[in-house]
Amino acid sequence: MVTGAGRVTENLLDQLGQKYNMTVIDPNADRGRTVAEKFPKVVVVNASANDVNTLKEEGIDGCGTFLALTGSSETNIVSCMVAREHGVRRTLARIEELQYIPEAESLAIDKIINKKLLNTGKVLSLVLDNNVATSQCLSLDKAEVTEIKVPEN
């Protein structure tokens, strides 16, 4: 189950939409229509991600993975909490406000994605590509940590 029918969801559906039974929930009818037209096998529901009744009707109780990808960090955190309460094993939330990340981690959200951090990691990978095996970047309010793994040679 995915909440939010934006570009991140469309990119995800490009990769996974045909392999899994997917339900996308979004209150914006135009975005929902676009996803439904582009991915006919995906069930699209025009509703809020915070509507617990809709989540139940769409089968959150039997859902293995819940992806909260709306443009609202707060909505994503709350909907992941609801998913956990309904027995969902894996949750992922898109959180754009960096100050929310530690709190979201303490709420047992399995994975957190943040465009700023992802982009920073990609830039580091590109800049250091020739001499670096992998790189990751974590940035919080008052600190930034960069992990770079350099191959032996």
Regions found by a protein language model. Name each.
Residues M1-N153:
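Cytosolic regulatory regions of ion transport systems
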